[in-house]
Design a protein with these regions (language model features):
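Short linear sequence motif anchored by a di-proline
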Residues: 1-208
Length: 208
């Protein structure tokens, strides 16, 4: 599961060869939650979208927590995400870290999960556009089984892409992208206790 993350520009610009279109003047985001806006990168470049996917075929543009994550194991079949998947509407969601609240000694305690190398984590996502009286640009983050480094934090984690398979995810065929749904990141990760900024809820969202 992934229900909160941060996007710090300093981290993004350290990986300029991957995030070539990341704006220099975009605002840092310290606590992004579902339905909030975040930066994404698709085959055409950088785009801000709202987190929680609205299918293009939906009758009304309703953002729902239930669509902020999509299971990698079922994304190709689930009706909410199937159209975006078949149309190769894939994106990456670069984050400097994401957050989970494992229960420790009976208490939910916020932990910040990040790469030990300080470079952004590249979360696999899908995007869609709803068109009505206006346009709503939205995305979801794919989730998978956790790697052993952080399997004590939560029974799900974002599907992380490594630098050498970003091009295939963004520009490859559906069959090529399908092979990445079971990819296991080679990045070394850390999960450290973290105090959220004032105003953060620390809530856990529904499992995905």
């Amino acid at each position: 599961m992934c229900g909160a993350f941060e996007q710090h520009n300093k981290a993004m610009h350290r990986w300029a060869e991957i995030l070539t279109d990341w704006p220099v003047d975009v605002q840092d985001r310290f606590d992004v939650r579902p339905t909030m806006n975040a930066g994404t990168v698709d085959a055409r470049g950088y785009r801000e979208r709202s987190w929680s996917l609205i299918p293009g075929w939906a009758k009304a543009p309703r953002l729902a927590y239930s669509t902020f994550n999509a299971r990698a194991e079922t994304v190709a079949e689930k009706s909410t995400f199937r159209s975006a998947w078949r149309k190769s509407q894939r994106c990456i969601v670069p984050v400097s870290a994401y957050f989970e609240w494992p229960v420790i000694d009976g208490v939910k305690r916020c932990h910040r999960i990040a790469g030990l190398d300080g470079l952004p984590l590249l979360l696999a996502g899908l995007w869609d556009t709803w068109v009505g009286d206006d346009e709503r640009h939205t995305f979801t983050v794919l989730t998978t089984q956790p790697v052993s480094q952080i399997d004590w934090v939560h029974h799900r984690m974002p599907l992380l892409l490594d630098a050498d398979n970003i091009a295939e995810w963004l520009h490859g065929s559906v069959d090529q992208a399908s092979r990445l749904l079971t990819a296991r990141t080679e990045r070394r990760l850390s999960a450290a206790p973290f105090i959220m900024r004032p105003g953060s809820t620390g809530d856990l969202f529904a499992d995905c």
